[in-house]
Amino acid sequence: MALYPGSFDPITNGHLDLIQRGSALFDRLIVAILRNDEKRPLFGLEERIEMLREVARDLPNVEVGSFGGLLVDYAAESGASVILRGIRAVSDYEYELQMALMNRRLRPEIETVFLMAGEAHSFISSRLVKEVIRLGGNIGGLVPSSIEGRLKRRLLEETGEA
């Protein structure tokens, strides 16, 4: 079983691609949202759980959870032996390598597996999606269509603009 962690604020087509590919590689995949009280997410935890369940509803071996604290502790508690991470660029690799090595030091029995982002998704990040939509750009193809509608509604709620 594998664990795919992230903030997923919002979920992008890059995340969805990794979820689909991870679902095909592992008999069970937990998509785990990090609860971070220091950040002010665009979407609350329950909203992100709902969105992830919605986009993964056709993947019966995928479940959605959330955690606070150390990722490797949550992985161990969940019975996951693998942490799945996506790599978009060299800069991602440098950060992810440090995290993987620290996780290995803390819990040597849990492996980290890196998947390269699909070519169509290698430039997508939640941060960029939020920036593009706030500046009035088109995010079609960057996020699942159901998420695009939610993003536009949330932006309208926050700013009065869409």
Regions found by a protein language model. Give the residues of each.
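Nucleotidyltransferase catalytic core that binds NTPs
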Residues: 1-162
